[in-house]
Amino acid sequence: MTDIQADPAVTAADAAQADTSSPTAHQGKPANAIGLVVPERMHFAEPLQLRNGSQICGYDLMVETYGTLNADRSNAVLICHALNASHHVAGVHAEGEVGWWDNMVGPGKPVDTNRFFVIGVNNLGSCFGSTGPMSPHPETGLPYGARFPVVTVEDWVNAQARVADRFGIEQFAAVMGGSLGGMQALAWSLMYPDRLRHCVVVASTPKLSAQNIAFNEVARSAILSDPDFHGGDYYAHNVKPKRGLRVARMIGHITYLSDEDMAAKFGRELKAEDIRFSFDVEFQVESYLRYQGDKFAEYFDANTYLLITRALDYFDPALAYGGSLTKAVAHTKASYLVVSFMTDWRFAPARSRELVKALLDNKHPVTYGEIDAPHGHDAFLLEDARYHALVRAYYERIAQEIGA
């Protein structure tokens, strides 16, 4: 782990000494468990102006919260989600589904809900309850389908700001996200510089590389070429382009894992005892990818996949400044924690260092941690003692600032 910063260091000693003791929040479950959570559907009647020039008139956002908002509303943390995640950040739903960042958020965890009020928002265009392609169009009553407008990271941030308004939160203690969520956190610091104290960007990038855009295009092509796609209006045909979604997920999943991790998990292990000279599954890694693809195709929406990957492609805050990221971040007022993982080749550490350099060029306070974890891009979702210690120590600093 390497620290590069313009403010007092979060050192290994800080991380080791960060308070890990928390009282049990609810009797009858582990002290660090949030327990059962119930999401809330927020409706917004006021039209949301989109970057593409159109509007969404009347929309819903699914929201989930953890912890207690303090009297001056200074302890709120917004968690922004990645491609296939949702508002369900932590805790457990009634059907048993555990939040996607439950190891990070909760009582006594790095983002301690005994001290912080944490908000998860499902983005517009997603398929987990917020208004998206599966939702009925207000004029026709039929699903939006392909008529749902193309949305961007900036549109999501504007919608999230309305959620903050609904809670009466003028300034977040922190906005945090991993991968695509990290792009949203960065966008928050640029679009609403007075509305967050800290910006936490994990396993992310200030813009996609040509290679990443290419991966997204191949994945979208798999969906668009599926005969069951029907131009995006497959709902009316009572079908789903599962074959395309399956391939798209398989492509994506390869980019989330490191070569080292895949070698350790699968190597060249065969599915059966010997090769069968067929085009069916022969290797364990093939079986794994097919399983992941099949599972994803059952619960995710194809139109949503197209929208979110395109939002990834479009994100480039430096574009309006002649390609200069240094100029793009000049006006931000937040302090930053930027974390990358050495084996992440989807959003390589070089991209995080690019952001760190731009921030330091402007003398903005930034702490940088580069973690030597073997799990590739997915490392941001997994437990790693060094990674979690760094995040814990940073949030300890935030808690001291706001008196949480």
Swiss-Prot record:
UniProt key word Methyltransferase: no
Residues carrying the site annotation Important for acyl-CoA specificity: R346
Region named Disordered: 1-30
Name listed for the protein in its UniProt record: Homoserine O-succinyltransferase
Listed GO MF terms: homoserine O-acetyltransferase activity; homoserine O-succinyltransferase activity
Biased composition (Low complexity): 1-25
GO CC aspect terms: cytoplasm
Pathway: Amino-acid biosynthesis; L-methionine biosynthesis via de novo pathway; O-succinyl-L-homoserine from L-homoserine: step 1/1
Tagged with keyword Ubl conjugation: no
Catalyzed reactions per annotation: L-homoserine + succinyl-CoA = O-succinyl-L-homoserine + CoA
Alphabetic keyword roster: Acyltransferase, Amino-acid biosynthesis, Cytoplasm, Methionine biosynthesis, Transferase
InterPro entries associated with the record: AB_hydrolase_1, AB_hydrolase_fold, HAT_MetX-like
Family from the record: Belongs to the AB hydrolase superfamily. MetX family.
Gene3D superfamilies reported for this sequence: 1.10.1740.110, alpha/beta hydrolase (3.40.50.1820)
